[in-house]
Amino acid sequence: MKLSPSALALAASIVASTSVFAADTVSPVPVLLQDLAKYQDAEKTTAKNIETFDTLDFDVYTHQKWDRLGESHAADILVHYPDGHTSKGLHDHIEELKPMFVFAPDTRIEQHPVKFGQGEWTAVIGVLEGTFTQPMPIGGGKTIAPTGKPFKLTMATIGHWTKAGVMDEEYLFWDNADFMKQIGLGH
């Protein structure tokens, strides 16, 4: 391809105006390399946070290793539950998690079909499964008899992570009406 003299002049002026050799401009390459390094660091942090979250659900939660919850949760964790209430602190969060295992001792999370994050945030979809095989305490010394029905709930967790690699805030989402229906207590 042969360029006309005016096209060559235009191309030369564009190159000169963006060239590292132009006196009044700075090369964008170092800035781009810095941005790339920041992006790669952020991606590594996100991957590490998601790996920590996988361990949380697949091992710590599923096997009720409450003494290890601090590996993924800050001591002052703020947790938002699907019904709108919150808990503050690791101890209170653990106390909120334990009752599920009383009436469904086989409760488990074994898969995260979707997981991603950006910066200090992660979003994970999990599948919570179990079977209502034991009496469910409802307060005042009363219980609901087990139905023997299994449940399989899709849930989502949005987590805010600190630089220390633990969540300081967690948003939990699942459909309580669907859960009650699956275990035979809803319509």
Place the predicted regions along the sequence by residue:
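Intrinsically disordered and other compositionally biased segments
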Residues: 6, 18-22
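C-terminal and inter-domain tail/linker signature
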Residues: 21-187
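Bacterial N-terminal signal peptides that target proteins for export
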Residues: 1-8
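Bacterial N-terminal signal peptides
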Residues: 9-17
